[in-house]
């Protein structure tokens, strides 16, 4: 589900004042200012105010917050379980009981203006496929995007992320390469490890040389993309 104008739901704890809007003069005195009661987009307090507002409401509905992830909420009723994850104004949720999911959607729509987007198929670069066999995650679309970003969409595929017996060291004497690009490539692959556990070791190995990457390190890094 997607919360519309989410930040406008936040209640401000601080005193914040704004100039009177153009065309609106209170009491014919242009020197008066308005005190905000609700957050506005562009206000530095807005994201936090929205999070506190949503967090308070979810606790009122019987949810408890995950200990490892502050954006994860869990609600248990007898043998029924409802789990939801919040990412700013996007909320994904699921339950082992369909009626519990439906009830949650209804109470949320009464409290906030939002739209239901149907069965989850894509979220933060993750493609989600659900069927009777289970729930399957992939990042094919994301992988194509990063291959294009680094000009490697036509690279010849290889069978393994690293050459057998690959030895890399910080004292490599090959030419230095563009550090920001190298770091960016490492970051892109780190996000990919969410579904590609087979490249984690290789990414960790080339990630050791981000402070001073050399051509040899870059070639090893590019191999992982292939």
Regions found by a protein language model. Give the residues of each.
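Long, low-complexity, charge-biased intrinsically disordered regions
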Residues: 1-226
